[in-house]
């Protein structure tokens, strides 16, 4: 009987991909889903949006390449995860931010949060959100200076800052004067980070990812739904207040593109629902009772940290597993 040819199998370290989708394919779909929001951002805030995106994406890619080379690891630029991180970080920044600060946030997101823990699939918190939070703590003025949308179209106008809708709403569940119309809120004519204002574009991108089965609807729906329920109670039954809360801040960006990150979210349905509800609860409580007007970033980071515990509680036990009983002697001891 002739000998069978020996086939060498390469077994790599976890996490193992259990899908027909490749990492680069998944990331490419995320980039495609972000294009409507990017186009809306350029319309709202001008060509500087592209410059910020180029800086964050370029710095993320360079940081990943150099850090992995120094650590003598393989080049992973081809998986496009650094591009997605750079794009999402840019979406979390105001259009007026100095470019060098955007570059610092990119280095932190890639080197400190991602590569020091082993690279893609190993980080325990979302890199883009962590980069944003560190920039917010380090440069609070730059990170909270919001340029009025569409001002760039008036060539003779000087930069005019504006408040975000969340800072204009009272903590008592009431609407204040001067808020943009709900139509303006939908299309993004309001103060905010360059990629978070146009709710319609973000929803289109989120629906695309769900249709392509890149993300599960469990996290975004439970996240947004929890915020809606709490704000309905806080707003004393006012659906208008709920609508403003859902369309304000980074809720749509966070729910569809940040909380659904594969590495930092649960893998089973029950865990995802708990994760989304937790994000919604924390976001709502920070908005209603915290000193900061927005809580999406902080809520996602906190729930990222709890993911191992959520998975421990919600992962089904293998069939036939029986809980080991304590021996009588051990109980007396």
Regions found by a protein language model. Give the residues of each.
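N-terminal signal-anchor module of multipass membrane proteins
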Residues: 1-61, 331-333
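Structural signature of hydrophobic alpha-helical transmembrane segments
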Residues: 46-59, 96-105, 185, 189-199, ...
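C-terminal ends of transmembrane helices
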Residues: 62-73, 110-122, 204-213, 256-265
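A beta-strand-loop signature enriched in Asp, Gly, Thr, and Trp
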Residues: 220-222, 229-269
